[in-house]
Each structure stands twice: as C-alpha cells, then as structure tokens.
Amino acid sequence: MPKSPHRTNLQSFYPIMIILTHLALDSNCWRIRREVDGEEEDIMPSEECYHKYNEENHFKVFSNYLNRKNSSHYSPIAPSYQQALLRLQVKGLKHGEQITKSSGKCNSKKLDTISAETPLRDRALCKFEYVLNYNPKRLPAALTEVKCSCPRPNSKLVGKRIFECEHLRYQVRVLMWDDSCNTFREHVETIALACIPVIQANANADGDDDFIYTIKAEIPI
C-alpha cells in the first residue's frame, strides 16, 4: 500500500517545528527587559569574541565570573592599589562600608617626600576613601566606589579656599533581580570613581578679586 504524501510531508516538517520551538524558547530565556525609554539598535561588533562564542551557557559562565568574590577581591571594579583595601568578611557585606584605612585628617601636614612610588591616594589634593556599594538584588552585587573625605583640599597645599572636592560619577549597566530573584532587568547604576578638586561656584567671593574675570568671546565667522 503506497504511503500517503501528506504523511511524508508531516514527517519532514517535524524537525523544522522542533528547531523553531527551540529557538523561540532560547530567545525568551536570554531576553532581558530593559529599563530605557526607547529601544535603540544594539551595537554588535563582529570582532568581539562574545558574538563568536557558540556555546549556550556563556551567560551562566559570565554571571558566575562577574559575581564571584572572596575576602580580598569582592568586586569586579576595584582600585589597582590593592594594598589599601581591607579584607572583608564576605558573609557580612554592608552597603556604604568603608573598605580602606583612613587616609588622615583633612588639614594634615604635607608629606615630607613625594616620589613616583608614593600611592596616588596619598598624593591626591582631595582626600578620599573607598566604600562598598552593595545590593544583593544586583548583578554584580558588590561594587567599590570613591567617597570624598573632605569638603575641600588642604589649605596648606592650595592656599585660599577657591577649590572644593566633588565626586566624578560614572554610569554602569547592571542587572537587577526582582524580589523573588526569578527574573531580572537591565538597570543603570551611578557610582563615584574619583574625588577631584574643582573651582567652587562662589570662588570669586572667597578668593582674590582678579582670580576670575570676564573674557569676551569672539563671534565665530
């Protein structure tokens, strides 16, 4: 008895249905809900290894690497001068916890000698400390950021009060979990990576009269 042509077509169609179903489920598993106003087209440089890697577990591998921490390396973003960092108890991480030893008082005396080997933290005009930015619902959960220790540089170094210390902030894309830790979405975290001396807004009142003056701008031709 000859086979029905419809039965043959259905048998050949089964693998296609399985592949399409797998692709649909796979795309839903890796889709991240974005917390942005508009959906801009993603930039996907072909030379990046991320786009060349064929294994399906790359997200799990990367997330494990990104969130891994121990008592000395508890953040993927950390200062290069590791000697300044304190060792923390990983089970007792607290948001805002200071993770460096104090760099001294705001009006401490000048260093007797300063060389190229002197840590940047000790040579900075604005004293700062490193603190822990911790959120257990975030990936990565632990980030290190800078906190200014003093409102302005040491007057023994800069003279009259025409400068103040402000945080230089950066925005970092992270993943934020829901309360049940079942789903996550893209989120933008703002952290301070530096404490820099800047001219304070009322510098003309605290400094010399001729320190700030008007410059006539030429009209471009």
Swiss-Prot record:
GO terms for cellular component: extracellular region. InterPro entries: Cystine-knot_cytokine, IL-17_fam. The keyword Signal applies. SUPFAM superfamilies: Cystine-knot cytokines. GO terms for molecular function: cytokine activity. Glycans are attached at residue 70. Its main location: secreted. Disulfide bonds join 148-195. Expressed in RMG and AUA interneurons and ASE sensory neurons. Keywords: Disulfide bond, Glycoprotein, Secreted, Signal. GO terms for biological process: positive regulation of locomotion; response to oxygen levels. The keyword rRNA-binding does not apply. It comes from the Eukaryota. It is found in: Secreted. Residues 1-29 form the signal peptide. Changing residue 194 to V: In db1039; defective aggregation behavior. Belongs to the IL-17 family. Ligand for the receptor complex composed of ilcr-1 and ilcr-2. Binding to the ilcr-1/2 receptor complex triggers a signaling cascade, activating the downstream signaling components actl-1, pik-1 and nfki-1, and results in increased neuronal activity in RMG interneurons in response to input from oxygen-sensing neurons. This leads to increased animal movement and promotes aggregation behavior. Plays a role in the responsiveness of RMG interneurons to ascaroside pheromones. Homodimer; disulfide-linked. Interacts with the receptor complex composed of ilcr-1 and ilcr-2 with the interaction being mediated by ilcr-2. This is Interleukin cytokine-related protein 17.1.
